[in-house]
Amino acid sequence: MKLLILTLFLATIVLAQALTVPLNFHQASRESRRRVPQKWSNRLSALNAGTTIPISDFEDAQYYGAITIGTPGQAFKVVFDTGSSNLWIPSKKCPITVVACDLHNKYNSGASSTYVANGTDFTIQYGSGAMSGFVSQDSVTVGSLTVKDQLFAEATAEPGIAFDFAKFDGILGLAFQSISVNSIPPVFYNMLSQGLVSSTLFSFWLSRTPGANGGELSFGSIDNTKYTGDITYVPLTNETYWEFVMDDFAIDGQSAGFCGTTCHAICDSGTSLIAGPMADITALNEKLGAVILNGEGVFSDCSVINTLPNVTITVAGREFVLTPKEYVLEVTEFGKTECLSGFMGIELNMGNFWILGDVFISAYYTVFDFGNKQVGFATAIQG
């Protein structure tokens, strides 16, 4: 079984100090989806404990695109992730015994005329172990935008097979500096401080139309042709992840009672699903008629999509409706097609905490407004 994911390839259009990067569809294994609970449990528990180390993984969804580092540029594919804040890539100094380094592009500081040594130790703790290395400084180019003097990590150890066979080389985080390892300014911060983009925001449009352009990531701009109606903004509750209040969750127009007084949610481009408390998601999937296998909802027959109810997520007083075609993932592996629920249960011990991933972002054009500390949603135009 494979999951639909979205892969970001380098292709850029620069308009008035803005950068737009088209996206394409790809697939990832079903097994990777099952690691979502462990990933987020580690990530948010660390935050709750007062640490500033972001913990994330990307097996379940991958937005990756080409960047270059150094002069002349050395090419890498990186995940663009709103759930972390650091940039890291494999180092040429990584031992050949580290498979993840051996199978991916590696940064060679000796080949760059703009490299500046730093050497500070760098570690991120993942569910499968620690990614460790050291900090370096160099120019980073995304499309036609070159960020000078960017601090990033050269990885010399990467944990688990998820990194060994990933389609990406490294990760480019798009969350806040407050959760950045070693308090390193994220790439988007430096885009702003160096005047490379004129607006303090970036936005995602994702398409789930088979065979169509997978979407786009825009730095410094909002593409008015990719959504309809108004953008509804919700203020952030923390300047860590892109976190905000989620008012309610309804099934077929009736509140499910999941939120009580309120829920908190994170909008994360590094997660393909909508994730929530295990008990709530189990009840939801059972109500939808999905069979729970290995913690995920599986429908016995894809024809049931036509009989399932809409679900509604309320944010900032606005109801954001998801139809069955939007929250059910129809996936094929080895010639067999199955339909999976787009809702995954997680145990965080943090109350009513939800993660709105690609299932939600593909239905609603999403604006990450750093300057005004808010996230905006509008009905995405598909097709």
From Swiss-Prot:
Residues 1-18 form the signal peptide. The keyword Zinc does not apply. GO terms for cellular component: early endosome; early phagosome; extracellular region; lysosome; phagocytic vesicle. N-glycosylated on 2 out of the 3 potential sites. Glycans contain sulfated Mannose. It catalyses: Specificity similar to, but narrower than, that of pepsin A. Does not cleave the 4-Gln-|-His-5 bond in B chain of insulin. It is an enzyme of class 3 (hydrolase). Glycans are attached at N118, N238, N310. It holds the Pfam family Asp. InterPro entries: Aspartic_peptidase_A1, Aspartic_peptidase_AS, PEPTIDASE_A1, Peptidase_aspartic_dom_sf. Belongs to the peptidase A1 family. This is Cathepsin D.
